[in-house]
Amino acid sequence: MKKLLCVIAALSIILTLSSCKESDSKVITYETEALPDSVDPLIASNDTELTILYNIFEPLLLLESDGSFSCGAAESYSLSDDKLTLSFTLRKDAKWSDGEAVNGADFAFNLKRAVDPSTRFAGSTALSSIKNAKAIMSSEQSPEALGISYDDGSLTVYLEREDSEILYAFAGPAGMPCREDSFDAAGGKYCMTKDTTISNGPFALSRWVKSQGEETAKFINNKYYSGPRATNLGGVYIPLKKADGRLDRLKNGNIDCGTIDSSEVSSAGEKNQLLSDYCSSVVMAFSSAENTAFADDTIRKALYFSTDRDNIQNALPQFYEKAGDIVSPDSVCCGKLWRKDSPLTLPENTDGQFSDVFSSAKTGLSEKKVTSLSIAYETDEQKSVVNYTAQNWQKLFGIRVDTVKSTRSQIIKGIKDGSFAAGLISFNIDGSSAYSTLLKLCAEGGGIVTDEGYTEAVYSSNKTLESLEAAESSLVEKCLVLPMYYGKKYYVFSSDVSGQSLFPYSGTVDFTKADLL
């Protein structure tokens, strides 16, 4: 009997080792060209950094594709009846990639960093409803004053006002942990090298080479991870190479997946698989600066209505998409699909219905002695888009229209002071959150919109899906912002890869569910 038990035990060990070996051998090669400098949750920004970040870290909550939330590092969460206290209970078995336990202090430390102005976290405005957060962000109080409490197994967040969008913050970088001792020991290089990066997600960073001639990164199965996103993959190897020839390398079996330019989509081949996501929303913003011609509603309306949206597809590279909204399609807000029942109404100059407006504007421009107008743009790609509008304005108003290439900050400044009549501005889209896009339009978030009514609606403690949709509509009704087109990013996968998807929050590849034949 003892011999039989020994044989069974031996077979069990062999099968276990065989299974581990099979999993370890499944390493996907994902090629991209963007060099990762930091995978610090509060600093990471380019596509490669975010791909690594969301695979090696796990936030308190996980955003699902339908806009709902599930538990990540949190075992459970609850919101008080008055909607001012958010409580998280942490998973008892959660560990860092070095085997240390994850606790409430780790999430608290990251939140304090997120609102600390010295961190310059791009998503800090989404945390402004937490007690004292605004005062901390304006350097009036210390990060230690942030309205949170914690112990080893929990984190509690106290809000100054009801915030229907606060859960999104905890499904992203602000909801990820940062261990203070590791942060301090890194000496300013936290999450900038393999040795200064520890994480709590299904993968852990195992290689990061930044030397010339070999720029690579690799993350492998985190043996200490026991959460809801356990993976069958052994890891993901990320060689950094220019995009030239990437499709050939994929077809020849040298790589398994990678990013491709929109112009290459049609060449990807039937056997290969494509995933895409919206990465930017490009709008035409219009000046309403006081003491300028653009403060005149009729003049601004005429410029707005004569902006050429019809020729966008002719002006743009293939696979860009004409926008019907400032917010990207399939976005969610307040737990619901954005504009499912109330599509944004955009102006269309059909049958000459705005001829009176154009005539009045032409007279107004003449009376104000306006002899030229300027439209600004950020990139060479955008020039052809603004050229169509410039031609329209010249024909309608009989004045010279210049197109000016400028920096984003100078375009925003020029629209605010009236140096530019309008400017083409691109905003990055963070996954499927409509609210994050609306925040980026606000001047407080570094955006272009100074309209008080819009800002008040976006930051309101009583905001709802309907009130936010109305706020967006007001930008169109006041002729301040006109949706133009969406930028998209594309990922191509060989037929040997299955189960791949994109993280709804970041729009980057989720390798936790992927498998390799």
Model regions and ranges:
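Ligand-site clamp/hinge motif
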Residues: 219-266
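Surface-exposed binding/hinge segments that line
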Residues: 124-182
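Periplasmic-binding protein-like
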Residues: 290-335, 385, 472-481
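Aromatic- and charge-enriched surface segment that lines or borders ligand/interaction sites
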Residues: 76-126, 293-295
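Extracytoplasmic/peripheral linker and loop segments enriched in polar/acidic and small residues
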Residues: 313, 402-411, 435-498, 517
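Structural transition elements
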Residues: 317-364, 381-382
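N-terminal lobe/hinge region of extracytoplasmic solute-binding protein
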Residues: 31-81, 198
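Gly/Pro-rich hinge or "lid" segments in bacterial periplasmic/extracellular proteins
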Residues: 159-231, 244
